[in-house]
Protein backbone atom coordinates (compact mmCIF):
# COMPACT_ATOMS: atom_id res chain seq x y z
CA UNK A 1 0.00 0.00 0.00
CA UNK A 2 1.58 3.27 -1.13
CA UNK A 3 1.23 5.86 1.63
CA UNK A 4 2.09 8.72 -0.77
CA UNK A 5 -1.04 8.28 -2.89
CA UNK A 6 -4.21 10.20 -1.94
CA UNK A 7 -6.17 6.92 -1.92
CA UNK A 8 -5.76 3.26 -0.96
CA UNK A 9 -5.70 0.10 -3.04
CA UNK A 10 -8.90 -1.90 -2.53
CA UNK A 11 -8.45 -5.33 -0.89
CA UNK A 12 -10.24 -8.06 -2.82
CA UNK A 13 -11.84 -11.23 -1.55
CA UNK A 14 -11.03 -13.84 -0.62
CA UNK A 15 -8.97 -12.30 2.17
CA UNK A 16 -8.86 -13.10 5.89
CA UNK A 17 -9.19 -9.41 6.79
CA UNK A 18 -12.93 -9.74 6.08
CA UNK A 19 -13.25 -12.30 8.89
CA UNK A 20 -11.63 -10.08 11.53
CA UNK A 21 -13.25 -7.56 13.86
CA UNK A 22 -11.95 -4.05 13.28
CA UNK A 23 -10.26 -2.35 16.24
CA UNK A 24 -11.86 0.53 18.11
CA UNK A 25 -10.14 3.90 17.86
CA UNK A 26 -9.16 5.63 21.11
CA UNK A 27 -8.48 9.11 19.77
CA UNK A 28 -9.56 10.75 16.52
CA UNK A 29 -6.35 12.53 15.49
CA UNK A 30 -4.72 13.66 12.25
CA UNK A 31 -3.59 10.09 11.48
CA UNK A 32 -7.20 8.88 11.64
CA UNK A 33 -8.41 11.87 9.60
CA UNK A 34 -5.77 11.07 6.94
CA UNK A 35 -7.16 7.52 6.71
CA UNK A 36 -10.68 8.96 6.39
CA UNK A 37 -9.61 11.47 3.72
CA UNK A 38 -8.02 8.72 1.63
CA UNK A 39 -11.09 6.50 2.07
CA UNK A 40 -13.32 9.34 0.90
CA UNK A 41 -11.07 9.73 -2.14
CA UNK A 42 -11.54 5.99 -2.86
CA UNK A 43 -15.30 6.46 -2.58
CA UNK A 44 -15.17 9.30 -5.10
CA UNK A 45 -12.78 7.58 -7.54
CA UNK A 46 -14.70 4.30 -7.50
CA UNK A 47 -18.12 6.01 -7.60
CA UNK A 48 -19.14 3.91 -4.60
CA UNK A 49 -21.64 4.67 -1.82
CA UNK A 50 -19.79 3.08 1.10
CA UNK A 51 -16.43 1.80 2.25
CA UNK A 52 -15.19 0.10 5.41
CA UNK A 53 -11.55 0.56 6.46
CA UNK A 54 -10.80 -3.16 6.21
CA UNK A 55 -11.73 -2.94 2.51
CA UNK A 56 -8.53 -0.90 2.11
CA UNK A 57 -6.46 -3.13 4.41
CA UNK A 58 -6.88 -1.15 7.64
CA UNK A 59 -8.34 -2.99 10.62
CA UNK A 60 -9.89 0.08 12.29
CA UNK A 61 -13.57 0.83 12.99
CA UNK A 62 -14.00 3.44 10.28
CA UNK A 63 -16.64 3.56 7.56
CA UNK A 64 -17.50 6.27 5.08
CA UNK A 65 -20.81 6.64 3.25
CA UNK A 66 -21.92 9.04 0.53
CA UNK A 67 -25.14 8.43 -1.39
CA UNK A 68 -24.46 11.33 -3.78
CA UNK A 69 -28.12 12.32 -3.66
CA UNK A 70 -29.17 14.83 -6.32
CA UNK A 71 -25.62 14.59 -7.73
CA UNK A 72 -24.35 16.25 -4.56
CA UNK A 73 -21.66 14.78 -2.32
CA UNK A 74 -22.68 14.57 1.35
CA UNK A 75 -20.24 12.16 2.99
CA UNK A 76 -20.86 10.75 6.45
CA UNK A 77 -17.84 9.56 8.43
CA UNK A 78 -18.46 6.81 10.99
CA UNK A 79 -15.71 6.18 13.53
CA UNK A 80 -16.41 3.41 16.08
CA UNK A 81 -19.97 2.98 14.76
CA UNK A 82 -22.43 0.92 16.77
CA UNK A 83 -25.98 0.23 15.64
CA UNK A 84 -28.24 0.62 18.68
CA UNK A 85 -31.60 -0.05 17.02
CA UNK A 86 -32.76 -2.32 14.20
CA UNK A 87 -36.39 -2.07 13.04
CA UNK A 88 -38.39 -5.26 12.76
CA UNK A 89 -39.60 -4.10 9.36
CA UNK A 90 -37.26 -5.38 6.64
CA UNK A 91 -36.33 -4.35 3.11
CA UNK A 92 -34.35 -6.02 0.35
CA UNK A 93 -31.80 -4.40 -1.94
CA UNK A 94 -29.36 -5.81 -4.45
CA UNK A 95 -25.94 -5.28 -2.88
CA UNK A 96 -22.43 -5.38 -4.27
CA UNK A 97 -18.98 -4.45 -3.01
CA UNK A 98 -15.73 -3.00 -4.28
CA UNK A 99 -14.00 -5.93 -2.55
CA UNK A 100 -16.20 -8.47 -4.37
CA UNK A 101 -16.09 -7.16 -7.96
CA UNK A 102 -18.49 -8.44 -10.59
CA UNK A 103 -21.09 -9.94 -8.25
CA UNK A 104 -24.27 -8.82 -6.51
CA UNK A 105 -26.85 -10.45 -4.26
CA UNK A 106 -30.30 -9.65 -2.89
CA UNK A 107 -29.87 -9.01 0.82
CA UNK A 108 -32.63 -8.38 3.37
CA UNK A 109 -31.90 -6.00 6.25
CA UNK A 110 -33.72 -3.78 8.73
CA UNK A 111 -35.52 -0.89 7.03
CA UNK A 112 -34.59 1.58 9.79
CA UNK A 113 -31.68 1.81 12.22
CA UNK A 114 -30.09 4.10 14.77
CA UNK A 115 -26.31 4.30 14.91
CA UNK A 116 -23.99 5.97 17.44
CA UNK A 117 -20.53 6.98 16.26
CA UNK A 118 -17.77 9.56 16.34
CA UNK A 119 -17.54 12.00 13.44
CA UNK A 120 -14.50 13.30 11.54
CA UNK A 121 -13.59 15.57 14.47
CA UNK A 122 -14.18 12.94 17.17
CA UNK A 123 -17.55 14.34 18.28
CA UNK A 124 -20.23 11.90 19.45
CA UNK A 125 -23.13 11.60 17.02
CA UNK A 126 -26.31 9.59 16.64
CA UNK A 127 -28.09 9.09 13.35
CA UNK A 128 -31.49 7.62 12.57
CA UNK A 129 -31.47 6.22 9.05
CA UNK A 130 -33.98 4.39 6.89
CA UNK A 131 -34.27 3.05 3.39
CA UNK A 132 -31.19 2.78 1.23
CA UNK A 133 -29.03 4.77 3.67
CA UNK A 134 -29.87 2.28 6.45
CA UNK A 135 -28.89 -0.60 4.16
CA UNK A 136 -25.56 0.98 3.20
CA UNK A 137 -24.67 1.71 6.84
CA UNK A 138 -25.52 -1.86 7.91
CA UNK A 139 -23.48 -3.23 4.99
CA UNK A 140 -20.37 -1.22 5.92
CA UNK A 141 -20.59 -1.86 9.67
CA UNK A 142 -21.00 -5.57 8.92
CA UNK A 143 -17.53 -5.44 7.31
CA UNK A 144 -16.12 -3.87 10.48
CA UNK A 145 -17.69 -6.71 12.48
CA UNK A 146 -15.86 -9.38 10.45
CA UNK A 147 -18.70 -10.29 8.07
CA UNK A 148 -19.60 -9.54 4.47
CA UNK A 149 -22.87 -9.27 2.59
CA UNK A 150 -22.33 -12.81 1.27
CA UNK A 151 -22.31 -14.35 4.77
CA UNK A 152 -26.12 -14.28 4.95
CA UNK A 153 -26.42 -16.43 1.81
CA UNK A 154 -26.47 -20.21 1.59
CA UNK A 155 -23.11 -21.90 1.10
CA UNK A 156 -24.11 -22.96 -2.42
CA UNK A 157 -25.13 -19.42 -3.44
CA UNK A 158 -22.02 -17.91 -1.81
CA UNK A 159 -19.68 -20.42 -3.51
CA UNK A 160 -21.37 -19.83 -6.89
CA UNK A 161 -20.96 -16.06 -6.55
CA UNK A 162 -17.32 -16.35 -5.44
CA UNK A 163 -16.53 -18.51 -8.50
CA UNK A 164 -18.23 -15.90 -10.68
CA UNK A 165 -16.21 -13.14 -8.98
CA UNK A 166 -12.88 -14.93 -9.52
CA UNK A 167 -13.73 -15.38 -13.21
CA UNK A 168 -14.63 -11.67 -13.41
CA UNK A 169 -11.32 -10.65 -11.80
CA UNK A 170 -9.41 -12.84 -14.27
CA UNK A 171 -11.16 -11.18 -17.22
CA UNK A 172 -11.26 -7.65 -15.75
CA UNK A 173 -8.36 -7.10 -13.33
CA UNK A 174 -9.43 -4.54 -10.70
CA UNK A 175 -7.71 -1.18 -10.69
CA UNK A 176 -8.08 2.35 -9.38
CA UNK A 177 -9.68 4.64 -11.95
CA UNK A 178 -7.40 7.54 -12.76
CA UNK A 179 -5.70 9.51 -15.50
CA UNK A 180 -4.35 6.34 -17.14
CA UNK A 181 -7.75 4.66 -17.09
CA UNK A 182 -9.26 4.14 -20.54
CA UNK A 183 -12.90 3.67 -19.58
Swiss-Prot record:
GO terms for molecular function: peptide deformylase activity. The active site is at residue 140. InterPro entries: Peptide_deformylase (IPR023635), Peptide_deformylase_sf (IPR036821). GO terms for biological process: translation. SUPFAM superfamilies: Peptide deformylase (SSF56420). It holds the Pfam family Pep_deformylase. Belongs to the polypeptide deformylase family. This is Peptide deformylase-like. It comes from Rickettsia conorii (strain ATCC VR-613 / Malish 7).
Amino acid sequence: MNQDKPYYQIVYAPNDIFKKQAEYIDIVDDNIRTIVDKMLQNLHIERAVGLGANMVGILKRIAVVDLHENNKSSPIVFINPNITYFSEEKQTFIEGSLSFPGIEASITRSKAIKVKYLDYNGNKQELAAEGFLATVIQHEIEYLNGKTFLDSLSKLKRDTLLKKMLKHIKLHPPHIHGSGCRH
